[in-house]
Amino acid sequence: MRENALELHGVCKKYGGFALRNVGFTLPRGTVMGLIGENGAGKTTTIKAVLDLIRPDSGEITVLGEHGSNPSVREKIGVVLENGGFPSAMNAVQVDTLLGRAYRNWDTAQFFRYIERFGIDKEKAIKDYSKGMKTKLNIAAALSHDAELLLLDEPTSGLDPVVRDEVLDLLYDFMQDENHAILLSSHITSDLDKIADEITFIHKGEVLLSEPRDELLDTCGILRCTADQLDALDPSAVRAKRVGTFGCEALVRRDGVPENWPVEPVNIEQIMLFLTRGEDAR
């Protein structure tokens, strides 16, 4: 059995009117987990809790077998936060100097290989970068200190498709080492279709599902039916539903639906929309 790179058990944190409620999931080494949910669902808060940037009110978080505040563990985590980054007056040369002091395993040669690959002018101030260039710089930094776990908060948000594919290629290369793992928060579900092994869905601070992606897509589907047909199903077969004037549609478990009923394939985006906007049928 593979070791877990990340474990969360019963994590709770209250922020005024928002709260993480009993958040729990495990991320094995050798795995890319997509963390999905609408804006404000708790994705960034969860990542900050893993990084020990905020302290949960209760619960337990284990990172690479230890507590996330352990300095030796922090050395092994590569981080890209959506609204994070380096001072805008700095350039890539200064970023290299800064991070060379911060990380024992900082690899200057590796960092500048990424800078060259990305076509970044190492003397240019970050304030003059495009959004895509800033993201590439942050990812280059995350990949240049021998990290084992990447925590990425919306790393492809706002990027054009070509740059997004380039970023995903880098993550794919990182995962060639089966000791590595990635937690990737994103609302761009097409990216997760390409790279994610597992999907964790968080809604209003609560994890509604955490399952292997292929298993989720293979076992679930969309059923369009009448209200009477929906009522005839075992409730355990219906994960979420929408009831309208002219009929119903439901996110269902295929093995709980009669074989002669047409169940359409489903993708990650549709699952997220059903669980966010549909009526919970648990």
Feature roles, as predicted:
Residues E3-L183, T189-S190, K194-H203:
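ABC transporter nucleotide-binding domains
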Residues R29, A227, R254-G256:
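Non-catalytic surface loops within mature trypsin-like serine protease
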Residues Q110-R113, Q229-A232, N267, I271:
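Exposed alpha-helical structural elements
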Residues L168-V252:
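ABC transporter nucleotide-binding domain
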Residues V238-R282:
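C-terminal coupling/interaction segments
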Residues L150-P155, Q229-L233, G256-N260:
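Short, surface-exposed beta-strand/loop "edge" segments at domain boundaries and coil↔beta transitions
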Residues N91, P212, E264-N267:
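Short loop/turn segments at beta->alpha junctions
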Residues Y114-R117, L170, T219, I271-L275:
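Residues that form generic nucleotide/phosphate-binding pockets
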